[in-house]
Swiss-Prot record:
The active site is at K125. Belongs to the NAD-dependent DNA ligase family. LigB subfamily. This is DNA ligase B. Pfam families: DNA_ligase_aden, DNA_ligase_OB. One of its GO terms (molecular function) is DNA ligase (NAD+) activity. Keywords: DNA damage, DNA repair, DNA replication, Ligase, NAD. SUPFAM superfamilies: DNA ligase/mRNA capping enzyme, catalytic domain (SSF56091), Nucleic acid-binding proteins (SSF50249), RuvA domain 2-like (SSF47781). GO terms for biological process: DNA repair; DNA replication. PROSITE patterns: DNA_LIGASE_N1, DNA_LIGASE_N2. It catalyses: NAD(+) + (deoxyribonucleotide)n-3'-hydroxyl + 5'-phospho-(deoxyribonucleotide)m = (deoxyribonucleotide)n+m + AMP + beta-nicotinamide D-nucleotide. Its EC number is 6.5.1.2. Catalyzes the formation of phosphodiester linkages between 5'-phosphoryl and 3'-hydroxyl groups in double-stranded DNA using NAD as a coenzyme and as the energy source for the reaction.
């Protein structure tokens, strides 16, 4: 299918500022869009932490939060008020602040971060809810939600009901502060295959609701920090394991370089684990004294997250394509995103009716994933822009019998027909893609789909953008096409039959084909009454008849008398 000539580009043009893509909005609109997204995130955040209900997928929330920060930076706005962390409802102070973790974009960033750092370990980045556990005199004295990193809610009553969390400790852990992740226990969870399952939201919901004590049995704990604990990492891990926090030791590995980090990351992505993960965390064994820990200042650890299974992408334009059969398809052009190492910059929405039902306009944020064979797929619209500037689709008068001849309204279906006849299913013109057909048609103004047969080698060579080797190849392909059998030319004319049915018919000339009745076509493989009728309509179409006479004049096999 080819893109409609008068495709409607959206109002979002993009430029680079400090390495980020920024919408070219007027100041008033920028302020409005930022305020709307900020309020939506705040509402979702409030529902998530107060009611334990996720109104949106965790990954979508994270990506939209990052998009908000990007927009705010584009306009020079303070990002401190961005609601990416829980609202501060609790007032219980953490004995040691939660620093958070810096995110590294790729292996190169990992290599750079590791340079100059020593005694490094890697752990899975368990996807759950962060908590502080305070042990005093060998007993669990308090459990505090992460909150803003300095203070949070007192979760002690709920945490006491989680069987997997030790209620008493000994030795160095008798009086200790631990930081970790409360997670949903899984059996044989393979992250690459099963995804995130909204695990973080499920854990938050269990901890927030008041009527589900039994559900807490399914929660576990992964300790990732023991502030002021043993300086020796193996000793630290050993003591945690003896106290009942065994997962930390089991899933902590010494790493010397980015290659070892990458191997661990890939292994945990594809192996069966007892929890959901969203990447890995690299940390130095040597940490500063806890009195120096501050939110956002943990430079001794960093995370390398897994690429999301689905990406939030910005719609930059809505385009319409018309296939050779006349079907109109809507395509969304996107600000490019990367999915599984694939650069995605457009996604097929489907029919005009489906597009209207989706209500997608330039400026909207949509969730895109990869379907079978790596084809981009639209999953949902996650955010709609305030401004709803939609293009008008082309008239729907196209069908399987239109646009064999070029006209102003037929440009896209005409190009689609050229692409089809050059494909391996028809004449097999190697090297003739859409761009080549467009260049030839724009230069030489084809009258119909076979006008290229009349081109001379000089005309092809004088086509803008064609190098000498390219033009010579096209000339050879066009000459070879003249030797193709009759059935190939009929396929190029888009007869509504499969190749198998056409071969079974035994027709080797236009004269034979004209003599066939509808009853004959019905008896062919995969050809019923409806398709047989379409063959008759195709054969009797005036444009098809004219094309058959033109091919006869060109001495194409099967069309002469």
């Amino acid at each position: 299918m080819r893109l409609w000539k008068s495709m409607a580009w959206g109002i979002l043009l993009w430029h680079s500022q400090s390495g980020a893509l920024c919408p070219a909005w007027p100041p008033a609109r920028a302020a409005e869009e930022i305020a709307r997204l900020q309020q939506q995130l705040a509402d979702w955040n409030d529902i998530y932490w107060k009611q334990g209900v996720s109104a949106v997928d965790d990954s979508v929330y994270d990506q939209l939060s990052a998009r908000l920060v990007q927009w705010q930076r584009c306009v020079g706005q303070d990002v401190s008020s961005t609601p990416v962390s829980p609202p501060l409802n609790g007032t219980t102070m953490h004995p040691v602040a939660h620093t958070g973790v810096r995110k590294l974009a790729d292996r190169q960033a990992v290599e750079q971060w590791m340079r100059g750092r020593s005694e490094l370990w890697v752990q899975p980045k368990v996807d759950g809810v962060a908590v502080t556990l305070l042990y005093q005199n060998g007993k669990l004295a308090r459990a505090i939600s992460r909150g803003n990193g300095l203070q949070g809610e007192d979760w002690t009553p709920k945490i006491r009901l989680i069987p997997s969390i030790p209620q008493s400790t000994q030795g160095a852990l008798a009086n200790a502060v631990l930081q970790g992740e409360i997670f949903l226990q899984r059996e044989g969870h393979i992250q690459q295959r099963m995804g995130g399952m909204n695990a973080r939201s499920k854990v938050a919901g269990m901890l927030m609701r008041q009527d589900n004590a039994s559900a807490l049995n399914s929660l576990g704990i992964f300790i990732w920090a023991w502030p002021d604990g043993p300086a020796n990492m193996p000793e630290r891990l050993s003591q945690l394991a003896k106290a009942g926090f065994s997962l930390t030791k089991k899933y902590s590995l010494v790493v010397k370089d980015a290659s070892e980090v990458e191997r661990a990351r890939q292994s945990w992505l594809t192996s069966a684990l007892p929890f959901v993960t969203d990447g890995v965390v690299i940390r130095m064994a040597k940490e500063p004294a806890s009195q120096y820990w501050r939110p956002g200042q943990g430079d001794w650890l960093a995370a390398w997250k897994y690429p999301p299974v689905a990406q939030v992408a910005q719609v930059s334009a809505i385009q319409f394509s018309v296939g050779k059969s006349g079907k109109i398809t809507v395509v969304a052009s996107l600000v490019p995103v990367i999915l599984d190492d694939k650069r995605v910059q457009r996604v097929n929405i489907g029919s005009v009716k489906r597009w209207e039902a989706w209500d997608i306009a330039p400026g909207d944020q949509i969730l895109v994933s990869l379907a079978g064979q790596g084809i981009p797929r639209l999953d949902e619209v996650v955010w709609r822009s305030r401004e709803r500037s939609k293009p008008v689709p082309p008239d729907s008068h196209f069908n399987s019998l239109t646009c064999f001849y070029a006209s102003e309204t037929c440009q896209e279906q005409f190009i689609s027909r050229l692409v089809w006849l050059g494909s391996r299913s028809a004449l097999g013109l190697d090297g003739m893609g859409e761009a080549s057909w467009r260049a030839l048609h724009q230069t030489h103004r084809f009258e119909h789909i076979f006008s290229w047969l009349a081109l001379t080698s000089a005309q092809i060579a004088n086509t803008p953008g064609f190098a000498k080797g390219k033009s010579e190849q096209i000339w050879r392909q066009f000459n070879l096409a003249r030797r193709q059998p009759f059935t190939r030319w009929i396929m190029a004319m888009d007869i509504p039959l499969t190749q198998a049915a056409l071969q079974a018919s035994g027709d080797r000339s236009w004269e034979q084909l004209l003599m066939r009745t509808e009853q004959h076509w019905r008896q062919l493989p995969a050809t019923g009454e409806r398709r047989a009728g379409r063959v008759i309509d195709w054969r009797d179409n005036p444009q098809i008849k004219t094309l058959s006479r033109w091919l006869a004049a060109q001495h194409i096999p099967g069309f002469g008398s």
